[in-house]
Amino acid sequence: MYLNCHSYFSLRYGTIEPEQLLAIASKNGVQTLALTDINTTAACLEFMRLSSNYDIKPVLGVDFRNGVQQQFILLAKNNNGFQNINAYLSDFLHNSELKIPETAPELEDVFVIYPYIHKKEYHLKENEFLGIRPQDLNHLKFSKWNAFRSKLVVLQTVSFQDKKDFNIHRLLRAIDNNTLLSKLPKSEEGRETDCMLPYQELYNLYEEFPEFLKNTSKILENCNVHFDFQKETTNNQKTYYDSEEGDYQKLEKLAYDGVAYRYPDYDEKVFSRIEKELSIIKKQGFVSYFLINWRILEYARSKGYFYVGRGSGANSIVAYLLRITDVDPIELDLYFERFINVFRQNPPDFDIDFSWKDRDDITKFIFDTFENTALLTVYNTFKFRVAVRELGKVFGLPKSEMDVLTTGKYNLNQLDKLSRLVIKYSTYIEGFPNYLGIHAGGIIISEKPIHYYGATFLPPKNYPTTQFDMHLAEDIGLYKFDILSQRGLGKIKEATEIVAYNHPQEPPIDIHDI
């Protein structure tokens, strides 16, 4: 019966972590639950992955708001609907000047829930409904909508667990508004009753309106989004060329063509190692992964960019032959199985370091070349000291007192009441997501549109960035490409250029010999 649940990924608003939300629902006898965080899908994949542990059917959606003003809730009927919601949300996240309208768009495979406002006019389409909160029931008896009960559903929002959580919610809202708690407007808070109720208690509230319960159940029954979290498959771009067989033939050719460059005096051991690696790479579905890395680095070489291939990929002779790495695994007796094997769950890993001067152009090349591409996010959480400072401001503590609290050099029993509250609630919000950042170098290149998996936002780098992190990406078979920035490579390049300028008679210095 819950169409509007928030996790703590409703940043500086919600207080419940996704798994905790499922545990609370299970305890209250809830069998189907909709996660609809505010203007984000950051928690959706984790929520779906964990839901089977609690025998709860997950429903995915988004609570669209301007600030705290709820406009409407969108629920996905299926994966196509989820993709449509993500694409629509991303339009707003990519352009901060856009405001979410009062009327929802016409999106395929999506249910729309509007919050009921007394005396407001609504013109509802077939897939649109009015959400009736418990406190709306008295007004509804005198509303014309009482005669249109087939379009009315239960809307009990869930943002926190209990009164303690509501206090945390108010503190988060004060932090978000950069104001003293005592001056936080009521309009910036949720309702203290926005908690999950036992199923029977919720049922009793709507006992006079059984149609609402029936309509709500019907919506939840018709929402069926599915993702495969089995790590045996990859959802990276499947092919670099036209077909998987064509890709394999290209990879095979590149590997054997590279023998003359890497091994002028080759022997049978080289070919035996190549055949073994190619067989495993093909079996594990990583042919296109190698080809995409090869294409990126072919471009880098064409531009004269220095780079270093690191990570467990240095164990691969195929990577060495494709000039992805410069480490000879035969000479150093490195085991390919440390990189890829049929029993290893972790994805393959190439860490490619570029000069800080060249990395931006490489990133641009990747986004220009590959269609379904995005940067990966990281969740920047409240660290204890940050929480202390933010809550210190909310409670009006002077900076000198906050400085003492952040050092930890104090006697808790000698602190005044406000300082003790700061310490108390800092331990509660420590670890809560505070804002989304950008992974140091992680890029995903997907077979399906990125919005199939989640919404994207646009950070200062101006490239679409996922709202899920690398761990969730791996859970759904999206393995990142690490394009990293190394200032030292830029300095080495500058040094070789200076040497070449001062000693033009000397042969050019190869960075690989340094």
For each of these PLM feature ranges, what is it?
Residues M1-I514:
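Alpha-helical scaffold/interaction cores of sigma-54-like transcription cofactors
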